[in-house]
């Protein structure tokens, strides 16, 4: 019997455009689009776009949220992000983005079930505090490459030029509400764009259209691994 798996909002787009698909951690994901070398080159010299929807996302909200994060690390300021180990199995560390005084988004880190459980344990006894798994509620798009910021400027985010690595901003993106997180990868400018799942494919296509002049290419998990793996990043792809 086949195991159940989840589909991202852009799944049908990937299939229509010839992606090689595989199951990764319970999700059907695009591994590549038939030309890994070109995908990696596009990211290194221009801009590439990846469907990162399966990335674990946990919403933490309430007036005691900062107090909870102070149990693990120095809580970031509003509009800032930081990495932190939130449990014994967080590898790599989780990434914490502070959206408002009382609201945070926690990305990655431990398998989301363990991460949600660990955060709820940490929140115990702190009063007004809510921890919610929102992984499937948001589409996540990873935009990487030296032209990524110029591309985003075409889609309307406010104050995009002033955003440095480790910053986050809630802003209209292609006319829908989005969350932008700047998280560079080994010196390569990179952004994570979170929008409501319902708008996922629409925003995906808007980004691709805006990136046409920059030679944008979609890339899959194979290219993502090459660019993010410390040992693989300097290897020539053939």
Annotate each PLM feature.
Residues 1-238:
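Basic, glycine/lysine-rich polyanion-binding surfaces/domains
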């Amino acid at each position: 019997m086949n195991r159940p798996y989840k589909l991202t909002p852009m799944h049908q787009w990937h299939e229509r455009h010839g992606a090689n698909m595989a199951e990764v951690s319970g999700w059907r994901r695009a591994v590549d689009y038939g030309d890994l070398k070109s995908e990696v080159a596009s990211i290194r010299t221009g801009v590439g776009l990846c469907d990162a929807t399966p990335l674990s996302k946990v919403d933490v909200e309430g007036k005691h949220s900062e107090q909870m994060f102070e149990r693990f690390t120095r809580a970031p300021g509003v509009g800032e992000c930081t990495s932190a180990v939130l449990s014994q199995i967080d590898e790599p560390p989780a990434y914490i983005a502070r959206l408002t005084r009382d609201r945070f988004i926690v990305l990655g880190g431990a398998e989301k079930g363990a991460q949600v459980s660990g955060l709820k344990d940490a929140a115990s006894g702190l009063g007004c505090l809510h921890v919610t798994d929102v992984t499937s509620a948001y589409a996540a798009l990873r935009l990487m490459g030296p032209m990524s910021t110029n591309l985003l400027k075409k889609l309307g985010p406010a104050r995009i030029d002033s955003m440095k690595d480790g910053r986050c901003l809630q802003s209209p993106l292609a006319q829908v509400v989005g969350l932008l997180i700047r998280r560079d990868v080994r010196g390569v400018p990179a952004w994570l764009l979170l929008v409501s799942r319902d708008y996922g494919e629409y925003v995906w296509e808007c980004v691709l259209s805006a990136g046409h002049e920059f030679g944008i290419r979609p890339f899959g998990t194979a290219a993502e691994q090459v660019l993010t793996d410390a040992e693989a990043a300097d290897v020539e792809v053939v």
